[in-house]
Amino acid sequence: MALLSEELSSILPNPDFDDEEEDYVERETSHADERQIGVKFHIPPYGQRKGWFPSSPEDFGDGGAFPEIHVAQYPLDMGRKRSAKSAGNTLALQVTSSGAVDYNAIARQGHEHGELVQASFRDLIPLRARLGVGEISLEKPSDEQKQEVANKTKLALQKILSKQIAQSQPKSAVVQQRDDPVYIRYTPSNQMGQALSKQRIIKMVTAEQDPMEPPKFRHKKVPRGPPSPPPPVLHSPPRKVSAQEQQDWQIPPSISNWKNPKGYTIPLDKRLAADGRGLNDVEINDGFAKFSEALYTVERQAREEVRYRAIMRQKMAEKEKQEKEQRLFMLAQKAREDRMGRNAASSGPSHAKPRSTSVSSEERSRSRAGSFSHHSESENEDEDSEAFRRRQELRRERRRQAEKDLRLSRMGAEKRAKLAEKDRPRDVAERVALGLSKPSMSSDTMIDSRLFNQASGLGSGFQDEDSYNVYDKPWRAAPSSTLYRPGATLSRQVDASAELERITSESRYDVLGNAHKKFKGSDEVVESRAGPVTFEKDIADPFGVDTFLNNVSSKKT
């Protein structure tokens, strides 16, 4: 027998399974289960069950409840309603070989058996750094293993493809597959004391099916179930979120600038926050500030120089005015002295002229004091008093004119325009339209002699044949009779040469074409013109501001 077993062992291949090894594995598994059960389902003895409640069917053992524990108990699910939903995803508590609770089952729930799931810190350690790395074989697989894996992969792919091809085919079309007939030997049994029948051979064939027959059942598409949860990725434990992080993660709602169908009242800060413009950082170039500062500096310098020029111009005008007044004063004084000298020469002899002049001045001063009076001194005093009155009248006229100018400067624009329109000289057409040139209504001008029965009327031929005048009387005869007639106030004893000079120098008709007031110095500039009218060309920069700015900019550059 020993030789036979040795020969058989040499001929037969090595066994894949060993009974002794299986017995050893079964014993280890049973011990582990007993240890697991002992740890997992520990029931305290009677009398020490205060605070303990059965939570799983294993707590009841073979059956039977605990009467001293007053809770709802269902030993072996007896008395539980079948319609009630089961626990579902509840997992049974498991322990490791050391007795600790195994939480890896929670991570592996919903995954296939061979899928790699990181469930502990040990899974994160590389293989080369783990303990017992030498026990793991890192050799390449053999050809048999490669072929076996390839066959499994091929079968899996064929299964998937066949399923997809079957789904793509139409469901309504019936394709009958003819199978080979099956022959069955049928032997009837003896029933109710009947005689045995003979054996028969039955031929079973597939029943014919109408291909145009509509389907008998309604196929419903079952919705796809939820996918398996992704494997967990180990990360740091969660921490409390700060208020700043919550504010950063807060996303404002989308607010339209055009539509508000609900009619909500949205604050301006929320509307601006939804716009997103405040998130952009606005960067302002320094060149703008430098450019603005340079412009401000140049403008200030230009204003200062313009102000200085205006002050200098004002001072020069005042100085010129003072010089003119001084010159006029000197001319007036010289004329007064000349007049006084002529009066003294006409009253006394020619050889006593200087003495009489000096005496007249002394006597005039004495007459003001009230010492005595003389004929020549009285005449000089009369002339001085008349000149003084004229000067006083001129001063009053200037004062009235200054007051009028002051009132005009304080008037509004509309009132000043009305006053200027009122003072402006009107032509004949405007005066006729306004009724200002209406003649005095006399009895002679209100009637027409042609309407009466008289010898010179229309009945007698109106007038002579050789006369061409249309009207019997001139128009506005009363005013025209006094236009060029000298007034009664004029003195009859007038020097002819002096009167002629006065009439020629008088600007009597300037009001018809010129303004009442002229610009200062316009009389000196007026020159006699010969030929066509000439115009002055406009000056582009009368005050030289553009030239000054160009010079300043050229100096800076």
From Swiss-Prot:
Region Disordered, annotated ranges: 1-32, 208-243, 316-444
InterPro entries: SKI-int_prot_SKIP, SKI-int_prot_SKIP_SNW-dom
Tagged with keyword Zinc: no
Chief localisation class: nucleus
Keyword terms of this UniProt record: mRNA processing, mRNA splicing, Nucleus, Phosphoprotein, Spliceosome
Biased composition (Acidic residues): 16-25
GO biological process, one term: mRNA cis splicing, via spliceosome
Subcellular location(s) of the protein: Nucleus
Ranges of Basic and acidic residues composition bias in the record: 316-327, 386-430
GO cellular component assignments: nucleus; post-mRNA release spliceosomal complex; Prp19 complex; spliceosomal complex
Ranges of compositional bias, category Pro residues: 224-235
GO molecular function: molecular adaptor activity; RNA binding
Keyword Transferase among UniProt keywords: no
Residue positions where Phosphoserine is found in the record: 228, 236, 376
Family note: Belongs to the SNW family.
Subunit structure of this chain's protein: Homodimer. Interacts with cyp1 and the small 23 kDa subunit of the splicing factor U2AF (u2af23).
Function: Involved in pre-mRNA splicing.
PANTHER family attached to this UniProt entry: NUCLEAR PROTEIN SKIP-RELATED
Name of the protein in its database record: Pre-mRNA-processing protein 45
Organism of this sequence: Schizosaccharomyces pombe (strain 972 / ATCC 24843) (Fission yeast)
